[in-house]
Regions:
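Glycan-recognition and catalytic cores of secretory/periplasmic carbohydrate-active enzymes
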Residues: 1-179
Length: 179
């Protein structure tokens, strides 16, 4: 899990971020959910390891990973004002993969790369090719509550782990927005 995480700040971006995860340890594509989300699982697993084995030789690495993701949540938490909701994810122009995308019927078809890029570029620019999207890139599905809740759950988990009121407030704001 940690091998697929951006632990250092991306100082080449307009908003230097760190802590987000990639789809794999090869770090070719940043992890982004478009309809459902399991984004909390990395924080949950690492938090459980820290709680259950705080003296393990790898515990400092687990903690550093959790701290990096907490920094990511804090860093993106003020970007959608006045709502205070967390943006969906960082997307890269020309970098998507549709092979595992389920779609309803042949008449719908898959989105084109041009459609994908247009949506990506409608995000908050980080650099020429990277954008932070307020909402997920919409293929066929719409809505983003599951994505917001995945991030909220991760923020609650890390708030408990670090006894961090700011993270707890970020998580609470996500639930308030949905309710």
């Amino acid at each position: 899990v940690m091998a697929g995480q951006q632990l250092e700040k991306r100082t080449d971006w307009k908003i230097p971020l760190r802590g987000f995860f990639y789809e794999s340890s090869r770090k070719k594509r940043i992890l982004a959910y478009y309809h459902q989300s399991q984004e909390h699982l990395m924080a949950e697993g690492l938090s459980m390891l820290l709680t259950d084995a705080p003296t393990h030789p790898d515990a400092p690495l687990w903690k550093a990973s959790c701290e990096a993701y907490a920094d990511y949540l804090r860093g993106i938490s003020q970007l959608i004002e006045p709502y205070g909701i967390l943006p969906s994810a960082v997307y890269e122009v020309d970098n998507t993969d549709y092979k595992n995308l389920y779609h309803e019927g042949e008449q719908v078809g898959l989105p084109s790369l041009e459609e994908y890029n247009a949506q990506v570029r409608n995000g908050i620019p980080l650099s020429k090719d990277f954008y932070l999207r307020r909402f997920p890139v919409a293929y066929q599905f719409r809505g983003f509550h599951a994505i917001v809740m995945g991030k909220a759950k991760a923020a609650f988990i890390l708030a408990r782990l670090f006894n961090d009121k700011a993270l707890r407030d970020i998580a609470t704001r996500q639930v308030e927005y949905i309710l």
